[in-house]
Curated annotation (Swiss-Prot):
Belongs to the tombusviridae RNA polymerase family. Readthrough of the terminator UAG occurs at position 297. Residues 524-641 form the RdRp catalytic domain. InterPro entries: DNA/RNA_pol_sf (IPR043502), Rev_trsase/Diguanyl_cyclase (IPR043128), RNA-dir_pol_PSvirus (IPR007094), RNA_pol_HCV (IPR002166), Tombusvirus_p33 (IPR013707). This is RNA-directed RNA polymerase. It comes from the Viruses. Keywords: Nucleotide-binding, Nucleotidyltransferase, RNA suppression of termination, RNA-directed RNA polymerase, Transferase, Viral RNA replication. One of its GO terms (molecular function) is RNA binding. It comes from Tomato bushy stunt virus (strain Cherry). It catalyses: RNA(n) + a ribonucleoside 5'-triphosphate = RNA(n+1) + diphosphate. Its EC number is 2.7.7.48. RNA-dependent RNA polymerase that plays an essential role in the virus replication. GO terms for biological process: viral RNA genome replication.
């Protein structure tokens, strides 16, 4: 038995650095898979299908399909000799009920004038008078066995073929067309010279559909109708032909049309897409407005800051004995913030900014630091189970072995990493540290409301707060960690065996990384991991696990241990014009800490690595950007991950949501950007709706002309560097005017809105392939892209005129939420 188990379920080795974990772990027998294999061997589907969550549902669904296939054969395709064997088996239970007596019968035959006579014994069945009950019992015992045998021998076509015909009906007008159009026959497995599988197209199918020459044109017309129903009527242009081609390839993949037929069907179907009914070609509304709608000049609009209308207190059972939140109300003399917007951009989304006032600060601390909302009520963040982070120690050991022992930076070495305003701040902190050493008071938090763009579509969200510590504390801790950040990232990449920590790369490099990750898999699926308020869920145990990485690099360092211990017991104050707030909090990541980014990378990578190790899945790829992650796996592992991941992370104290899986590379969303193919390869492109709505808003005070010029220059240069060769977005950023950069301007670094990825720039043109890829990523067809670009070309900015009012005109983007 053990030998059979080893043959069917081989042991899987999981390596963490140079250490193998889980080698001797016995893989339990999966009864569900075993029953599936046995049943499917009879059903002859040719593959293991595991779409149901329970064995009962799986078997019932399979039996329904089998019964439907046999019934369809009986009603539509039966022939005379099909049911001889089932009827013969059905008569077997009657045999024991009969008694056979013989009688002699004389038979005479005349041949060549002679008559020959001989006796023949003829059996005569009859119902016996004795032993009837015994014979009846024997017949009843045989009845269920024979019934199963009759069902098993009933004729039907192969189930995979039956399913193919059933799915084809979705693309046909009636059942006869689906049956006549698709004649299914076994496919050939293509092998290379070394015996490897050769993939021609998107996938290699075991069963393919052969469309004979007379049937190719009707099938091409049908899939053209389906493609037009999905995408709409488009102009006959190269980019739109590519869009139709992608949709029709997906349809033929689903119908399992063989590749030799696709070569003939695809051009016919693409041509059919541009054959319009009478009157359609004259309808200009189908192509989008190419005429000027009287676009107004893009003047500045000033929008005042907002104050939250929700006031909630912390429940008494949430705070620990050592935790406190004290609110002191002052005179109502709060100042309003302003957010500036350039009017006339074709985007409906609008953004506001939270004022720095007591009401906003209190709600931000209550809902983003102390409490989470659960079932409509405020509650404490979930806490990890005992020993949960101890199971992640193999990952830490592997990373620390690659990093080794580190040495602390000097003050000058730490300052060399900074420039501008931060350099001046840290220089003053270093001068102070030469006089007075760091103390526990330097770890106290100063809290304020973040000036963040808030979408009006989100209602009244809780304001975000920033909680920096004293620069003196940041200098001392930064001397240990600032120069080790990149080394730790590379060590994590080494443990995963590929680029995992996406930091410090250009948008082009990140796009190439995702292309390489996607190509690693035969049938890839990408799953977004959405950590709800990741910083808030960092418990004391999670922070201690993160700190163990740093302690391992500096073994026995008492000052580092003291600095890290102060992060576990936080004391802070928030000063606003209309009051103050004093609080104490155990655990929780403070957004102003110098190790916030590095710590989030380490925690997320460790938890995902431990989770995949827990499942025993070796084939996976992770892209991590702090609390934003994308996990790429084989499609066969999808349901297992969707079912088990939230519970695993909840045991670690994190609320993790598994987003909807995507099966196309362009559909992957990572840091609000999608991979898009362009002339130079692949590039991560920000969501067009987000970019065109957020980037016309500025939360900084740009009332003076010099700051406006600096902001416009930054948007132009930075935007084009990130979007060269990309439809729509490149045109959008080119509309920001270029001005002479002022020689001396102290606030230029605060208005540039630098994105987390650097742009590589370059001179590229928009190709039909990039428009098709852009459509796959954001759902804008080639015609819609051209209409938006035409609209943007007529959009003129006027940053130096009088402040106006918001003027919005309808556009293609209005139907989507930014």
């Amino acid at each position: 038995m053990e030998t059979i188990k080893r043959m069917i379920w081989p042991k899987k080795e999981i390596f963490v650095g140079d250490f193998a974990t889980g080698v001797n772990r016995t893989v339990p027998v999966n009864i569900f898979q075993l029953v599936c294999r046995v049943v499917l061997r009879y059903m002859r589907t040719g593959k293991i299908e595991c779409d149901s969550d329970s064995m009962t549902k799986f078997i019932v669904e399979l039996l329904k399909t089998d019964c439907a296939a046999k019934w369809e054969w009986f009603m539509k395709r039966r022939q005379r000799g099909d049911y001889i064997v089932p009827l013969s088996i059905a008569s077997i239970p009657i045999i024991p009920l009969l008694s056979y007596a013989t009688r002699v019968r004389a038979v005479s035959v005349k041949a060549f004038g002679n008559e020959l006579s001989f006796n023949v014994r003829v059996p005569r069945p009859s119902v016996p008078k004795k032993g009837l009950l015994l014979r009846l019992a024997a017949g009843l015992a045989l009845a269920p066995i024979c019934a199963l045998a009759v069902y098993a021998t009933l004729p039907r076509e192969k189930l995979s073929v039956f399913k193919l015909r059933t799915e084809a009906r979705a693309h046909m007008e009636d059942e006869r067309e689906a049956t006549d159009c698709l004649v299914v026959e076994p496919a050939r497995e293509l092998k290379g010279k070394d015996g490897e599988d050769l993939l021609t197209g998107s996938r290699l199918t075991k069963v393919i559909a052969s469309t004979g020459r007379p049937r190719r044109r009707p099938y091409a017309a049908k899939i053209a109708q389906v493609a037009r129903a999905k995408v709409g009527y488009l102009k006959n242009s190269p980019e739109n032909r590519l869009i139709y081609q992608r949709v029709m390839i997906e349809i033929m993949d689903k119908d399992c049309v063989r590749y030799v037929d696709r070569d003939v069907i695809l051009p016919l179907a693409i041509g059919c897409c541009f054959v319009y009914p009478d009157g359609v070609e004259e309808s200009a509304a189908l192509w989008g407005s190419q005429e000027s709608l009287g676009v107004k000049x893009g003047g500045l609009v000033r929008l005042p800051g907002v104050v939250t209308q929700i006031n909630r207190d912390i429940p008494s059972d949430v705070l620990l004995p050592q935790e406190v939140l004290e609110v002191r109300t002052g005179p109502p003399n709060a100042k309003d913030r302003n957010i500036f917007m350039v009017a006339g951009c074709p985007s409906q989304a609008r953004f506001l900014v939270h004022n720095h006032c007591l009401k906003n600060l209190k709600r931000g601390l209550v809902e983003r630091v102390f409490c989470v909302e659960r079932n409509g009520k405020l509650a404490r963040t979930p806490q990890p189970t005992k020993g949960a982070f101890g199971r992640l120690s193999p990952f830490r050991k592997a990373v620390c072995e690659k990093v080794g022992v580190a040495h602390r930076l000097g003050y000058d070495g730490f300052l060399s990493y900074y420039s501008g305003a931060k350099l001046r701040t840290y220089t003053r902190a270093v001068e102070s540290l030469h006089i007075t050493p760091v103390s526990e008071r330097d770890s106290h938090l100063t809290t304020f409301v973040k000036a963040e763009k808030i979408s009006t579509s989100k209602g009244d969200p809780a304001p975000r707060v920033i909680q920096p510590r004293n620069p003196r504390y940041n200098v001392e801790l930064g001397r240990y960690l600032r120069h080790m950040e990149s080394k730790l990232m590379k060590a994590v990449d080494g443990v995963f065996g590929e680029t995992t920590c996406i930091k410090g790369y250009t948008a082009d490099e990140v796009g190439a990384i995702f292309r390489a990750k996607w190509d690693r898999f035969d049938k890839p699926v990408a799953i977004g991991l959405d950590a709800s308020r990741f910083d808030q869920h960092c418990s004391v145990e999670a922070l201690q696990y993160e700190h163990s990485f740093y302690r391992a690099m500096y073994p026995g360092n008492k000052l580092l241990g003291k600095l890290l211990e102060w992060q576990l017991h936080n004391k802070g104050k928030g000063y606003v014009p209309d009051g103050t707030i004093t609080y104490r909090k155990e655990g929780c990541r403070m957004s102003g800490d110098i190790n916030t980014s590095l710590g989030n990378y380490l925690l997320m990578c460790a938890m995902v690595h431990g989770y995949m190790r827990h499942l025993g899945i070796n084939e996976f790829s992770l892209a991590n950007c702090g609390d934003d992650c994308v996990l790429i796996v084989e499609r066969r592992n999808l349901k297992q991950i969707q079912r088990t991941l939230p519970e695993y992370f909840l045991n670690l104290g994190y609320t993790m949501k598994v987003e909807q899986p995507v099966f196309q590379l362009e559909e992957v969303e990572f840091c609000q950007a999608h991979p898009v193919q362009f002339q130079g390869g692949w590039k991560m492109v920000r969501n067009v709706r987000t970019a065109m709505s957020k980037d016309v808003h500025c939360v900084n005070n740009i009332r003076d002309l010099a700051t406006r010029r600096a902001w416009s220059n930054a948007q132009h240069h930075g935007g084009l560097a990130l979007s060269a060769g990309i439809p729509v977005v490149e045109t959008f950023y080119s509309r920001f005017k270029l001005y002479d950069v002022p020689r001396k301007h102290q606030r230029i670094d605060t208005v540039t809105n630098v994105h987390k990825w650097r742009g590589s720039g370059g001179s590229y043109v928009v190709t039909p392939e990039s428009r098709a890829s852009f459509w796959a990523a954001f759902g804008l067809t080639g015609d819609e892209q051209l209409a938006l670009e035409d609209r943007l070309e007529r959009w003129e900015m006027d940053l130096f005129g009088e402040e106006g009012v918001d003027a919005h005109e309808p556009s293609i983007l209005d139907s989507a939420v930014a």
